[in-house]
Amino acid sequence: MSNRKYFGTDGIRGRVGNAPITPDFVLKLGWAAGKVLARHGSRKIIIGKDTRISGYMLESALEAGLAAAGLSASFTGPMPTPAVAYLTRTFRAEAGIVISASHNPFYDNGIKFFSIDGTKLPDDVEEAIEAEMEKEITCVDSAELGKASRIVDAAGRYIEFCKGTFPNELSLNGLKVVVDCANGATYHIAPNVLRELGATVIAIGCEPNGVNINEEVGATDVRALQARVLAEKADLGIALDGDGDRVIMVDHEGNKVDGDQIMYIIAREGLRQGQLRGGAVGTLMSNMGLELALKQLGIPFSRAKVGDRYVLEKLQEKGWRIGAENSGHVILLDKTTTGDGIVAGLQVLAAMVRNHMSLHDLCSGMKMFPQILVNVRYTAGSGDPLENEAVKAVTADVEATLGNRGRVLLRKSGTEPLIRVMVEGEDEAQVTAFAHRIADAVKAV
């Protein structure tokens, strides 16, 4: 990815009004993508967005660029990222485009592409789009210009898809669920899915105004959800992020249930039902408790680099079906092609109903290890702290002390001059002290 000028691991993202998230850039991106995608034959593109106010501006720019290249755009309106992937497949569109910055604040936005099969665009297509970006815009003949239309039943189609991933013989009757939609793209989807499956639903974070997406709500901040679950005496809470590709849950006691625990529940249930193919993929940040719990069940476990893109690559490499990040990206390849918060949440609910167990009890087979993360800022250009001998020595000493009952992970942030120091083990006081000891060594570089 290092030779890319615009595309990162998750499309193109930035602050609105600053390059590259400007109207003129996005118009040209639409044109360049249109030129490349038109070579493949189909001339239909699906465009969805989350609830950021800048989405209106950016979808108009994309539409203009695509039309100039001769491609027609079909708009879904606010729609979760996994819904756009699904609709791209079912409409046999050449590509799907999502305008979203996921869990970021409203003043950020981004552009992400899906291919005709609902997966990420191949690298060679992204590279071809970047090459077109270097050319001057030329407009096709007037008779060949693209058109724009709306998919009026997009939400209904996706709601039915989500419900179809929940076992027909089960229902959510009798369950009280609080769902937090982060004032994002699932606000008109998730509550309806749960209600139509029989649950009593209390919805929060479902009043988007263009600037409140992810603001003290959603998968990145579950405090409001925890409080509401306790106040309503609900059976559980479900928190989605701004574009609906992450899910974090809350049990009836108000305890947070993260992506590692969600994957454990789904993998164990798959094993019980005889439906688990192969093992499970986590990341370098996945809790050691997950690895040990899966090992006890005889389920193979593999770690990918941090990022749902790398989880998906590892799943494809191994031919496995289930992967997750502790941040709540859960990928279930037997159900969908990308991380889907609603679909993952439904599989946990199915396990609860089928086993007559609370979410709290479903998590009890996995003991979470204390995991301490310290971010240390360093001066870019002053040498690599990870190659420093003193840092290496302290890290080796901590690893030797922890043995096979803990882990140390040092990695650079992909976006800032930060070293992330993570120490994990059985004793919280010990791992906290170890994390700060390593962090102090990094600071001294």
Curated annotation (Swiss-Prot):
GO terms for molecular function: magnesium ion binding; phosphoglucosamine mutase activity; phosphomannomutase activity. It catalyses: alpha-D-glucosamine 1-phosphate = D-glucosamine 6-phosphate. Coiled coil: none annotated. Mg(2+) binds at residues 102, 241, 243, 245. Keywords: Isomerase, Magnesium, Metal-binding, Phosphoprotein. Pfam families: PGM_PMM_I, PGM_PMM_II, PGM_PMM_III, PGM_PMM_IV. Binds 1 Mg(2+) ion per subunit. The modification Phosphoserine is found at residue 102. Activated by phosphorylation. Its EC number is 5.4.2.10. Gene3D superfamilies: Alpha-D-Glucose-1,6-Bisphosphate, subunit A, domain 3, Alpha-D-phosphohexomutase, C-terminal domain. Catalyzes the conversion of glucosamine-6-phosphate to glucosamine-1-phosphate. This is Phosphoglucosamine mutase. It comes from Salmonella paratyphi C (strain RKS4594). The lineage of its organism: Bacteria, Pseudomonadati, Pseudomonadota, Gammaproteobacteria, Enterobacterales. The gene is glmM.
